[in-house]
Regions:
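Outer-membrane beta-barrel porins/channels
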Residues: 1, 5-154
């Protein structure tokens, strides 16, 4: 029997005297649990601990800027430990059109590539369509990856 767990906690607050503005901080741990059986051997998943924060900053009547950052630490079973840092921003117009960008710094000597992302999204009546593209160097196997998602919020 196997059970891999993720755990996290998020703390959110409003910014006084700034309607709609707020900030949040959180911590998250993933891949917690025993080794998993793969073919004929058992392997441990690399655990990850992340701490991060975000600020939602509305400006004018129809615009919002969200800024995010996080710091991650990978704990591999083979004693390869790696630190990574990510930061991003999202601009929203009327909460219907979003433009996004971000950067992830990872130590390529420890198997964690650095890359930038750019994306956009549209939302109407709870339906959202999002698109993103990863820009990375040749050392990153996931370079030039595209993501498309369609969802519904209720």
């Amino acid at each position: 029997e196997m059970c891999i767990r993720d755990r996290g906690i998020l703390y959110k607050r409003e910014i006084k005297d700034w309607e709609g503005a707020g900030w949040s901080v959180g911590i998250h741990a993933s891949n917690l649990g025993p080794k998993i059986k793969y073919l004929t051997s058992k392997e441990a998943l690399p655990a990850m601990v992340k701490v991060g924060g975000a600020a939602d900053l509305p400006f004018a009547s129809m615009h919002r800027l969200t800024l995010t950052a996080d710091l991650g630490y990978r704990l591999s079973p083979d004693d390869v430990q790696a630190l990574n840092v990510s930061a991003g921003a999202e601009y929203a117009w009327m909460e219907h059109l979003m433009l996004r960008g971000g950067y992830h710094y990872g130590d390529k000597n420890k198997g964690d590539a650095s890359y930038a992302t750019a994306g956009a999204g549209v939302e109407y009546a709870g339906v959202h369509l999002d698109f993103a593209w990863m820009f990375a160097g040749h050392e990153c196997l996931a370079r030039n990856t595209f993501w498309i998602s369609l969802g519904y919020s209720f």
